[in-house]
Each structure stands twice: as structure tokens, then as C-alpha cells.
Amino acid sequence: MALSLERKGEIIKTYQIHENDTGSPEVQIAILTERINYLNEHLKINSKDHHSRRGLLKMVGQRRSLLDYLKKKDFERYRSIVTRLGLRR
């Protein structure tokens, strides 16, 4: 199941840089993290769902790319988003 519009809106409001910001790396990383967490819970119950596992790995790779970009571009924003989301880096 995809993120509900309400939940996605909450995430965007929490992590946006300015009022109309929906595509900054911080927002994208936060949305991907929410989707990754949902899929992790799904896969704990449905361990044989290999199609979803592949999608999860793709999302993790996308988030990793966005984090690497942000780390290169602005290290302070990178540290901030990692801390706020509770990622292990």
C-alpha cells in the first residue's frame, strides 16, 4: 500500500525548506524512509514476497544516492536529516 495523501502531506510539512518545497533532498529522503519502514514491516509478516523485497532494495539505493548527494552538497543539512530521521550513519 502506498503512503496516504495525509501522511505524505505531514512528512512534506515537517521536512520542507520553504513553503512550496516538495522536491528537496530532505523531503525525498523522508518520504523514502517512511516507505522503507512500511515495507520492512510488511516483509516481516510476508517473508516470501520477493517482488516487494526487490522494490525495498531499490528504494534503499535511491535513498542512499540522495544522502550521498546531500552529503557532498551541504554536509550540515545531511547531518540534520540523518539525525532527525534516526538513520544509522
From Swiss-Prot:
Q: Which Gene3D superfamilies match?
A: 6.10.250.3130, S15/NS1, RNA-binding (1.10.287.10)
Give GO cellular component annotations, separated by semicolons: cytosolic small ribosomal subunit
Q: List the disulfide bonds.
A: none
CDD domains noted in UniProt: Ribosomal_S15p_S13e (cd00353)
* Single GO molecular function: structural constituent of ribosome
In Pfam terms, one family for this protein is Ribosomal_S15
The protein's superkingdom reads Bacteria
Extract the NCBIfam families matched here: S15_bact
Which family would the database say this protein is a member of? Belongs to the universal ribosomal protein uS15 family.
Stated name of the protein: Small ribosomal subunit protein uS15
